[in-house]
A protein has these predicted regions:
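N-terminal and secondary-structure boundary signal
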Residues: 2-421
Length: 421
């Protein structure tokens, strides 16, 4: 990250601003910690916490919100929790870009850095000391928004994302997991220490549009998969056309299984299956199946969507940030993403991922109105209606229709009762 006098002054202000919070709210560490018991007891619910950040570049305010979130949602425990000696795996959305625009205009491409740092501070208060950051993509850009500097400040170990073919044979710094009910991948490699004993995973996604409609908490954990297995989006060329060393880990009847699902969805008349978009309906279908394969073998302790400011566009250099002052979280990332998708102006029933997840037994509904919603107020959950929250249109280029603007909402009415019947 480019260090300027302005940036140094803002960091000093942020540190000063959090000092009184640390003294007023800090908790004595105990041998274990846990997610708030109400969240644990309601795994099918989604929780929304309003934040108070006046401007997306207000570092002090964002740091305070991250720390306040951690203090609200993670609690010290004497027993029946997660030992503080565990390794905590942090998975923010690290996407960062630089193009012809000022850096501030690209700030919404990934999880906010100061919110991320505030969460780390809150976890350290609980006595946690062993942190790992893992990411497959865009190593060159990890510090564009100062995220690598944050990891260095707090002793967070960062992985080396690139691997050679022999590393897959040797299992070098990766953990392999067999998929119980596969469609595409029968085995998936993740960067160590994912799925190793004595680890706990925290998923901190961004609220933003993407070619898969929106990239939220379910897609965020895709970045834990070792390259090139992580390439879920290119369709058949990373399935039947994947490198030879990957082929033993791809289902022997993948074409039959994917095509059978696809043709059934066309027959049922789901929206946008006639789109001629480059990220085609089949690309979306394969991405959803790979995502469901991965979801069977990844189990975060908590999933978060940071929406202090959201972003429309393509997920990278095209798009605008919108100050939305909202953080969403929950145990079930499909349900969490349904709410994030709906509040982003889209209708979840029109998106392949949720329908396929239900067909494959990972969801019991993809109707956002059937998800219990709570607002987190002063450290406590308060039951709300989904309509109590403002929708912010996050336009995407997902499966553009003929005559439709390139960036649009996927908001066609969907008859959930017909599908349920």
């Amino acid at each position: 990250m480019d260090i300027t006098r302005r940036h140094l002054l803002s960091l000093a202000a942020a540190a000063a601003a959090t000092a009184p919070i640390r003294l007023a709210g800090a908790r004595l560490p105990k041998p274990q910690f846990a997610v708030h018991p109400f969240v644990e007891a309601n795994p099918k619910a989604v929780f929304l916490k309003r934040t108070n950040v006046p401007h997306k570049m207000d570092e002090a305010a964002k740091l305070r919100e991250g720390l306040a979130f951690a203090r609200d949602v993670f609690v010290p425990m004497e027993s029946a929790g997660i030992p503080v000696t565990h390794r905590v795996i942090l998975k923010p959305n690290f996407t960062s870009v630089r193009n012809e625009r000022p850096n501030e205009e690209n700030w919404g491409t990934g999880t906010d850095p100061q919110f991320y740092e505030g969460i780390i501070l809150g976890l350290k208060e609980l006595g946690l000391k062993r942190f790992h950051f893992l990411e497959a993509n865009n190593f060159h850009s990890w510090n564009y928004r100062g995220l690598a500097d944050i990891n260095d400040r707090h002793g967070v170990e960062m992985n080396e994302p690139d691997r050679r073919e022999r590393n897959f044979r040797d299992g070098f710094e990766m953990s392999w997991t067999k998929v119980p009910d596969p469609v595409v991948y029968t085995r998936i490699p993740h960067y160590a220490p994912v799925n190793e004993p004595d680890t706990w995973l925290l998923n901190i996604a961004k609220w933003k549009a993407h070619g898969m409609c929106m990239t939220l908490s379910t897609k965020n954990v895709q970045g834990l998969v070792v390259k090139p297995y992580v390439r879920f989006c290119p369709g058949w060329k990373m399935v039947t056309g994947a490198p030879a060393f990957m082929q033993p880990d791809i289902h022997g009847k993948v074409e039959d299984r994917v095509n059978r699902y696809f043709e059934n969805h066309r027959r049922l008349g789901y929206a946008r299956y006639e789109s001629s978009a480059n990220l085609s309906p089949m690309n979306q279908e394969i991405w959803a199946h790979k995502t469901c394969d991965n979801s069977q073998v990844i189990n975060p302790g908590l999933n978060i969507i940071e929406g202090i400011y959201g972003r429309d566009g393509d997920g990278f250099g095209v798009g605008q940030d919108h100050l939305t002052n909202l953080v969403m979280f929950g145990k079930d990332r499909f349900r969490l993403d349904m709410i994030g998708m709906y509040l982003g102006g889209h209708e979840p029933g029109n998106v392949n991922l949720f329908r396929i997840a239900k067909e494959r037994g990972m969801l019991d509904t993809f109707n956002p109105w059937e998800v219990p919603v709570y607002e987190w107020v002063a450290g406590q959950p308060v039951r709300r209606k989904l309509s109590d929250f403002t929708r912010t249109p996050m336009k995407t280029y997902y499966l553009q229709k003929d005559g439709e603007p390139e960036y649009h909402l996927v908001n066609e009415p969907f008859d959930y009762d017909r599908v349920k019947a």
